[in-house]
Amino acid sequence: MESIPAQTNYRVGERDLKYYIFDWDDNILHMPTYIHLERRLANDTWVPHLVSTALFSVIRNDTANYRPPEGDWEKAFVEFRDLATDDISKFLVDARLALDRVLQGIENAPPSFETFRKTLVEGRIFAIVTARGHCSSTLRRGVEMFIERVLSAAEKAEMLANLRGYVAYYDGEDVNLAKSDAEILSDYLALNKYHAVTSPQFRQLVEGVLPDPDRSEARKQFAVRDFVEHLFNIIERIGAKRPISVGFSDDDPANVHAVEEYIRTELARRFPSVRFVVYDTSDPTLEKGHKIVVSGQLDLGLD
């Protein structure tokens, strides 16, 4: 990260407590990562067929015409894993390509691109919850790449000023002054959650906890709950007494519906003081997606 003079925005300590949960693919970035399937032809033979994540969300239940190679979903999603043979994660390679296409004006950014950018600049705590199978550290490196390549020098300075403001407000000015910009940024990134819900790491987290751990929707529900519990642990530690809101955005209607129902039936009852808002970003023509207020009254300010 380029050198930026350290400043502190002391006003951030009075902000509302707004937090965000983002799906990655086709929500933050259109990743050039493909799912390896087989497609049935008219003569009942099967041929290899590469599918984008956007198309897969539409055809994934069409088992009559699409199937994984040799019936093995691991082979279908090989590009969505961190492999020991890779010098650099396929996720990071594809993230760089996807960012290039947006920054060069080749394609429009997905619906949550600018919201994610704003979240980083404001120094808000967030979670990445994706159906990918990468390590959490890989997702974090993707966020670091986004910060480095997307944020302008002025936005990076504003982000650091906001982060220093939070540190000064909650941990004290001595702690703020003792830390370098690199340490401030690293501490912030460590506060966030990076859940790739088909990764071996995440499977260990849900094993014995979820009755149906193989369902992507169930894993995303668990990841959302884990993040909200994480937030409340932080809020209790710092003793903040302000309105709390959590926004969730995803481009897959099945995930949107599953999380919306989970919030209504479980999280809204457990956390009645929180305003939960879900954004369905499956329609790329809607700039920030279709907004669904699930519970609470506080405006997230994303309209």
PLM feature spans:
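Non-Sec secretion/translocation targeting segments of pathogen effectors
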Residues: 1-2, 302
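C-terminal cap/substrate-recognition subdomain and adjoining C-terminal extension
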Residues: 12, 16, 120-127, 133-303
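Alpha-helical substrate-recognition element adjacent to the catalytic core
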Residues: 2-198
